[in-house]
């Protein structure tokens, strides 16, 4: 691989795989990748994408094999605690919080089991794929419990007699329900993050990292943004500006032949609901139009 091209590690399969690639594509990347290939080539940007296991991503960035990585905060913090326990500092840097991959690492007990807060954990066996995060959680609360480390199928551990309860990732909770478990405590709120190597990169690479970060910011702002256009009486402008959700100063344009009315254009960085439009109309707005924003650079 060309050392002057950025190397970005993403999950090859799983809940973060498609959103990670989609983010890069929305940042302008045209990715060439054959079926089952583990490396994708950026045709229009000096960037290659490595498709790997999610728990390998922090290591690849830590060891400077990859310049950037998109990974879940749960995986990143588990690796950080593991490195610390082994006397090694975590060298990767978290540079962006991403707006996908939201879930939580949670404790769950069999349905019907009593729960009296975290004191119920004392002396219990807890199955998990995140032993370092769980150990950190227990240590902070001075709780002595046995951690049973499993690489998968954690949710069936209580039914197999391997554990009394579990600590696992929860998104919708449907898997817990299917296995007759109920969530009782949150250990960590998680989401996708973008990490980078701490190395001083060559100037060309550094420039592309900065450009990519700027594009990521733009993509995430666009997802939350709408462009609103409307007509309104000049006298209603203070109230209209108050009602526009999350907008900066709007653009005010005089209307031809209507001295007392103007056109208002604004980018709103929050959701625009029907109730918002109805409130705007009540204070005198008309010809309201809400458009999606395709690209934005702050």
Question: Which residues does each predicted region cover?
Answer:
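Small-molecule-sensing regulatory modules
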Residues: 1-47, 71-92, 97-99, 104, ...
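Signature of uroporphyrinogen-III synthase
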Residues: 59, 104-108
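Short, structured active-site "lid" loops
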Residues: 46-68
